[in-house]
Structures are given as structure tokens and as C-alpha cells.
């Protein structure tokens, strides 16, 4: 992968917020998804239950609400970690240190690390898939950009000596924070192979 700082900048919203949303449209969306996917073995306990287990951040510390990412200089990222209420948990400058060839989804993932002071040490190391689709796709009718990631106080907690993920089924996910409710619903629908809405249900 080619690291491009611009791909990461901006506001990011934790996918977990979609799972607990009380907006009628998102609840309708999940109801339809649950019905459409209930026969699949992976979703036997329920679609939302599956994703809450896969994407959950509570076991690693405070439940995340999202990130705010700005350019710290020409290459590095200043990442502000937000809690579920949108309040800052930590903020530090992260340096791109390389890649993991077989990371989340078996794809190349970017490795970031900060040497800055942190209140929450689990934010020291960040492993993340490049955002997909590109952020610009949204302007042309594409889905919101999203990415899967993992984080820990050190790399040994994320990657074993064999170069494989220590927790291969842990999939915290961030989505472009600029998305409308319709765009958020359509991510959920597309994930489960349902037709995207052209407008919110009434």
C-alpha cells in the first residue's frame, strides 16, 4: 500500500454508534437486515449481536466514539481519540512506521505509533486498513469510506511472533464522520447485500 496522509484526515465515527442508534430509520434498517440475514450461520445469534462482538471497543478501555484526524506535519497524523459522547480521551501525533502484509481481512494494513504522552496507553500502537472506498467516492454516489483497525499499548499485543494477528476476529470499524443518516444506513444495507435506499423511509 502507498501511505497518503490525505486519505486519513477528517472526522471518523465508530461503527458501534450505528448499532445502538435509536433513530427510526436506522432501526428500520437493522430490522430488515436481521430478517434478510437470519438464515446465515454466522448470524444465528442475531446480526447486531455478531457485530457488537466483532467491533466492540469496551474490552480495550473506554467505548470509542470516533477520531478526529489532522495533519501534524507533512507526513504524520494527529489523532484525537473520542469517547462515545464525542469528548476527547487522548490526542497524540502518530508516525506511519510501515505495514503488516497480512492484517485485517488478510490485507495489507498500515502501522502507526506515537511516542507522545498518553492518558490511555492502549492508544500507543494503531494498526489499520487503508480507508475504502476512497473518501472522494462519496461525492460521486459511492458509499461512505470506512476502515477496520486494532490498537494496543504495544505491537506484541497485536501481532504474534509468527507475524499473524493475535486477535484476528476483532474488527473495530470507523466510518467517515461526514456521512448523513441515509449514507450511514446504506453502509449497513450494503454490508448485508441489501439494495441501498435512495431516501430515508417515512
Range-by-range predicted roles:
Residues 1-13:
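N-terminal helix-cap/turn-to-beta initiation motif at the start of protein domains
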Residues 5, 28-31, 41, 49, ...:
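Hydrophobic transmembrane signal anchors and adjacent membrane-proximal interface regions, especially
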Residues 17-45:
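Internal, charge-rich low-complexity segments
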Residues 18, 22, 44-55, 187-190:
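Short, Lys/Arg-enriched charge-dense amphipathic segments
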Residues 35-63:
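Aromatic- and Gly/Pro-rich amphipathic surface segment
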Residues 61-202:
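Calycin-type beta-barrel ligand-binding domains and close structural analogs
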Amino acid at each position: 500500500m502507498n501511505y497518503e496522509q490525505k486519505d486519513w484526515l477528517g472526522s471518523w465515527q465508530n461503527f458501534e454508534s450505528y448499532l445502538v442508534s435509536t433513530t427510526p430509520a436506522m432501526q428500520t434498517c437493522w430490522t430488515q437486515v436481521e430478517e434478510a440475514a437470519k438464515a446465515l450461520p454466522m448470524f444465528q445469534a442475531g446480526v447486531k449481536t455478531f457485530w457488537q462482538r466483532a467491533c466492540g471497543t469496551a474490552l480495550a478501555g473506554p467505548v470509542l466514539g470516533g477520531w478526529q484526524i489532522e495533519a501534524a506535519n507533512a507526513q504524520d497524523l494527529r489523532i484525537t481519540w473520542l469517547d462515545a459522547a464525542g469528548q476527547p480521551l487522548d490526542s497524540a501525533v502518530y508516525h506511519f512506521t510501515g505495514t503488516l502484509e497480512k492484517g485485517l481481512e488478510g490485507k495489507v494494513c498500515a502501522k502507526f505509533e506515537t511516542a507522545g504522552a498518553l492518558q490511555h496507553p492502549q492508544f500507543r500502537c494503531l494498526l489499520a486498513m487503508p480507508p475504502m472506498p476512497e473518501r472522494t467516492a462519496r461525492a460521486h454516489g459511492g458509499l461512505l469510506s470506512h476502515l477496520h483497525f486494532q490498537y494496543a499499548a504495544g505491537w506484541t499485543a497485536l501481532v504474534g511472533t509468527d507475524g499473524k494477528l493475535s486477535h484476528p476476529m476483532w474488527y473495530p470499524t470507523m466510518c467517515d464522520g461526514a456521512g448523513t443518516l441515509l449514507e450511514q444506513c446504506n453502509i449497513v444495507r450494503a454490508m448485508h447485500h441489501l439494495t441501498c435506499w435512495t431516501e430515508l423511509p417515512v
